[in-house]
Amino acid sequence: AICGHEWSGTLSAVGSEVKSFSEGDRVVVAVAPACGQCAPCRAGQADRCFVSFMSALGRDAMAPKHGGFAPRIAVSASRIVKTNPALSDIQAAQVEPTTVAFHAVRRSGIRLGDIAVVQGAGPIGLGAMQWVKAAGAGVVIVIEPNEQRRAIALELGAHYAVAPGAAADELVKE
């Protein structure tokens, strides 16, 4: 299998039963849909769906054989979302991690003026940092071991970006 997630593409064909997409549509991958039947789904925690998780691991019938690094893949219509055709491939590929970051911040219950600590300044961490700022966090602290990523976090509006360790622990305690 060829790996790859956080991809975008253009549909080269659609199945005869598919009515919501057309050949030529620009799409991005979505997280596998929740089944609605397993224990987490019944408890209102669709983000922890067993079926969705197994699909993400390539272990069910809905999972594509190959990922986004393959030149062509077959994907269930339930796993894709139309995107703005004006977005570049790089921009469109950020839809999934941005959505993950948004969901995490929404679940956090952050309120206006809160202090937010974001662990990591990769794509999802930087997205979460921007979402907590948009949600009204008063102070945003990013903890990241990579100096270049810390610099990016500061450029994007973090109040502090520090390496993990005693200094980070002290800053968070303040």
Residue ranges of each PLM-predicted region?
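Conserved SAM-binding loop and adjacent beta-strand
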Residues: 3, 75, 96
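Phosphate-binding beta-alpha-beta segment of Rossmann-like dinucleotide-binding domains, i.e.
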Residues: 31-70, 90-91
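Short amphipathic alpha-helix with an adjacent loop that forms part of the alpha/beta core around
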Residues: 167-174
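A short glycine-rich beta-alpha junction/loop motif
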Residues: 72-78
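Glycine-rich beta-strand-centered segment in the early N-terminal region that forms part
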Residues: 1-42, 84-87
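Mid-domain Rossmann-like dinucleotide-binding core that forms the NAD(H)/NADP(H) cofactor-binding site
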Residues: 78, 84-166
